[in-house]
Amino acid sequence: MKTLISYFLAILLTVSITPLEVFAGETERIEFEDGSYFTIQIEESGARASGTKTGTKTYTYNSSSGTALWKATVRRTFTYNGSSATCTASSCDVTIYNSDWYVVSKSASKNGNSATASVTMGQKILGITASKKTASLKLTCDTNGNLS
């Protein structure tokens, strides 16, 4: 009985101290002629030895004054083992901060070690669509669990 309890405690201790990595990559910026811009950020998390990594890539659309108007986030889960990587789950979400904006279209797909999403947003002024912006998001995992 003592051996069983010791074994159980050893497993519990091993599981509870497995480090979980959370990494927020550098923020990239894409500017438009009117002064508005996208900020793009990749975040990833996953236990080092688990062979599973969850990543998000977020495009935030900002006005020329720096106000966030909406964001599109693609979230993917990958498995990897040093010789291959596969996207196992995916989702795409849109958060709207300014009520002038609405979702025109949204799609997501996964294929092998990559996942893509496309979000087109429209802006209505006085009930008429005045502009549209599209965010094309692609997230890829290499065989070592590195996201790009």
Question: What do the predicted segments below correspond to?
Answer:
Residues 44-148:
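Mature secreted bioactive peptide module from preproproteins
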